Amino acid sequence: RAAYEEGVTLFDTAPAYGDGAAERLVGEALASVRDRVVIATKAPSEELAPKALKAACDRSLENLKTEHIDLYQIHWPNSKIKIEDTFAALVELRSAGKIRAFGVSNFGVKDLAPCVAQPDYLPAANQLAYNLLFRAIEYEIQPFCVKHNIAILCYSPLLHGLLSGKFLSADDVPPERARTRHFSSKRPHTRHGEPGAEAETFAAIDEIRKAARELDEPMASVSLSWLLMRPGVA
């Protein structure tokens, strides 16, 4: 609720966060201002068959204490379920008024190809990891989304706080946050088995910090401003 009081109007959650607890918290916190906010949540990847998807949507509606979901997203692709069937079910949910729009999350070009072939199935948005230090989407999926007018919603925009400027070295980062490929696989919470790029990552962070200082702006603001100017970012 404090975020709303500071001007935030889009709230994104998922049933996977705390087994529905996050949805229930969002629903309770925003109940009195529901008509002034946009609520987005996600369909679990294991529940993308039409019947299961509709049941998952109903659970989210109940958790969120709302009559409709503004943006209902597929959390991750699932190659075992025919994506056309999933999108047909999403269209039905939209027609029934249970969702206002549907989107996807973590979808690549191959995942989205069937949607382009059927205009009714084109998602409103694709939620992707994107920030100054993680720009993999720029190779293929970002241009694809721009071409097909699919908005990009960014998660990890400050890379677990690294782009806030509060950490001066890899050792300053809490272990549970030091788990991306930027960090050595020797860090306890990593799972990638790669050497990482800690020196390079923090050298880049130092340069961003210097640029922010020259602009007399917080490093987080500079990082987010850069992101907002990227093609396709909503």
Identify what each model region corresponds to.
Residues E5, R94, Q118, P157-L158, ...:
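Conserved short secondary-structure transition element at the edge of the structured enzyme core
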Residues V146-A211:
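Glycine-rich, positively charged active-site loop/lid region within alpha/beta enzyme cores that binds
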